[in-house]
Amino acid sequence: MDKTEIINKLVAYKKLLEQHFDVEDVFLFGSYANENPREDSDIDVAIVVKKLNDDYFKDTPLIWKLRKQIDDRIEPVLFEKGKDQSGFLEEIRNKGIVIK
């Protein structure tokens, strides 16, 4: 699967997410963003929401459920804006691809 096809899938996934969350950004990161995927690579996606609907442990199952409507290889990671202390989201912002 090429990068354009992956991005098109993620645009559709973002639209689904926007029906349930106040989405600020969605990023493709990992092997597809770095243009070195293998045949068995998953699709790493960072989802940044302005505010969680409930709490992380209630919202995370929903993003996983929604991905099944698009592609089971999507591996979403949920972030609440301004709450990531690890620096992981900043690295994704710098190296990932914004999904518009």
Residue ranges and their predicted role:
Residues 1-25, 34-39, 50-100:
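Catalytic core of pol beta-like nucleotidyltransferases
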Residues 27, 44-46:
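Short, well-ordered beta-strand segments
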Residues 29-31:
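Glycine-rich beta-strand-to-loop/alpha-helix junction loops that act as flexible
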